[in-house]
Regions:
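Flexible loop/N-cap segments at domain edges
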Residues: 1-14, 22-26
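Charge-biased C-terminal accessory regions appended to nucleic-acid-, cytoskeletal NTPase
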Residues: 18-75
Length: 75
């Protein structure tokens, strides 16, 4: 379904944000988007998962969409 496709896309976005944070914690894209689009604890969990130190972070579609609205209003 469309909702499942959206959830998978948001999950990939969480993974990419976590990877950016692992490479460079002060990356401008990471700082601007990660905290607005996802609960930061979930980003940290995903970072730990990528390093093999913990469970996978959970992407929240509603939180992601709320963050997108906030970002759209800022621009």
């Amino acid at each position: 379904t469309i909702e499942q496709r959206a959830r998978r896309a948001v999950d990939r976005c969480l993974s990419h944000m976590a990877s950016l944070g692992l490479e460079d914690y002060n990356n401008e894209v990471f700082l601007r988007y990660a905290a607005r689009l996802f609960p930061f604890q979930e980003v940290r969990s995903e970072m730990a998962f990528i390093q093999g130190k913990g469970p996978k972070g959970k992407a929240n579609l509603k939180c992601f969409l709320d963050g997108m609205l906030v970002l759209a209003e800022e621009d």
